[in-house]
Amino acid sequence: MTHILTIAMAQLNQLVGDLKGNADAMLQWRAKAEAVDLVLFPEQQLIGYPAEDLVLKPAFQKAAARELERLAAATADGGPAMLVGSILKEGDALYNIVALLEGGRIAAIRKKHELPNYGTFDEKRIFAQGPLPAPVEFRGAKLGLPICEDGWLPRVRTHLAAQGAELLISVNGSPYEIDKDDRRLEEVFATRVAETSLPLIFLNRVGGQDELVF
């Protein structure tokens, strides 16, 4: 990586289903971070997390796509790029995604590969599994973009390292539970960084939804 990137991490609460409100909050945060290269937002920040069966409604899927395009258009001003968590409908498949927004467009999309299906999570019922993701080229750097569970398990991280990623950016919707911080330290920070020898940025959300606290 030859270029020094300045990255801002936006830990925002969100309201499930409030697409415009969530998008407006991201744009307001971006306006305060005008001197950075990239602003990061948590997993599914645009739609709210977990949105559960709301994401299965075609009208909601289309509205989410429109708001993502609106966010992308805002980056035409030459300010910071944004990494935004949302959903993507392709054919009959629905994906949990992160989108890199830069230069007024959606510059890249990566789909979540590891879908959790335990405890409060039933993503295999809702989402299709994305392919193992390739790194994203951004301003002279190769970024690996594991989405939440992608970063907890080794497959995606080691694949990204083998594909030449220089920095891992993991956006999360990881709820609180007893000893969770210690688990993150061991399972994500120490173990996965040691496996790949790559620097890691880990961003989680704040707030709560239903019975979950982040």
Give the ranges of each region predicted by the language model.
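Enzyme catalytic cores with a strong preference for nitrogen-chemistry domains
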Residues: 1-214
